[in-house]
Regions:
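Residues located in well-ordered beta-strands
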Residues: 136, 151, 225-228
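Glycine-rich ATP phosphate-binding loop
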Residues: 139, 146-154
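N-terminal accessory/targeting segments that precede structured cores
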Residues: 1-136, 144, 160-187
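Short beta-strand elements
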Residues: 138-142, 242-245
Length: 254
């Protein structure tokens, strides 16, 4: 049964669909009808109605939040199923989210460590080096002088992921039932794949184990260096890794 909170969120999704005139995406579902009603009652809210479908879809997913952005990123890789112009637009989606406050990161790290940060780190930068939908990264220096980066899960991210996945699954079932092209895209399977990806991202110990295995696989390789994990300070919610300086892979000029 759909709860009131979910109904309110679905209404918000319908509003975004109306904003970008994407009502037809959900075909004959009640959500599409609600989006058309919103577009009719508040036509001034419609944006980018002359833009190509792919661009409107990208902007809508961006508005709907980080979990929907990840769904769009995953869809962009399905070039065997999506038209090239839509796949190209979705590939432009970036997992960019404003960082949460440094004091919250400190609290999360201390909770995981079971001791004050000052007992483990001689330095801990409150300003995040990078921030994404599931976690963010802080620079730090261990008490022994080693430079490290500390990855911290966002407060409450587990509950938010569960809520959004429930909604996305509802939408996938709607699309699967009413959209004639659903058999090619297989939306329910796609959401299950997204859920698996997010489940892995919510467990930093699993990520650390994968990184350690990768390091073992490339031991002695002169072309690739994988940073070391500091297992004494790595938990499900917090991961500490050797800091390595380099050039971003997308910096072609460098």
């Amino acid at each position: 049964m759909i709860r009131f909170r979910q109904i309110r969120r679905l209404a918000g999704i319908a509003s975004v669909l109306a904003k970008y005139r994407l009502e037809d995406v959900l075909a004959k579902t009640s959500l599409a009808r609600l989006a058309r009603l919103i577009a009719w009652v508040q036509p001034w809210r419609a944006k980018a109605t002359d833009e190509p479908l792919g661009r409107r879809l990208r902007m809508a997913l961006d508005d709907l939040g980080p979990i929907f952005v990840k769904l769009g990123q995953m869809l962009s890789t399905r070039r065997d199923l999506l038209p090239k112009d839509i796949a190209d637009e979705l590939a432009l989606l970036q997992d960019r989210v404003a960082p949460f406050p440094g004091d919250q990161a400190r609290t999360a790290v201390e909770k995981a460590l079971g001791q004050p940060i000052s007992e483990v780190f001689s330095e801990f930068q409150d300003e995040a080096l990078a921030s994404a939908s599931v976690a963010q990264v802080h620079a730090a220096v261990l008490a022994n002088g080693d430079e490290v980066v500390v990855k911290v899960l966002r407060p409450g991210i587990g509950a938010r992921v569960r809520r959004d996945l429930e909604l996305i699954n509802i939408l996938a079932l709607m699309v699967d039932r009413f959209w004639t092209g659903a058999a090619n895209v297989r939306p329910v399977e796609l959401v299950a794949e997204l859920a698996g990806t997010l489940h892995n991202e919510l467990d930093l110990q699993r990520e650390a184990a994968n990184a350690s295995q990768l390091k073992r696989n490339f031991t002695g390789d002169r072309e690739l260096y994988v940073p070391s994990i500091y297992w004494d300070y790595t938990f499900r919610q917090v991961m500490v890794m050797e800091r390595v300086y380099g050039i971003p892979i997308d910096n072609v000029e460098a």
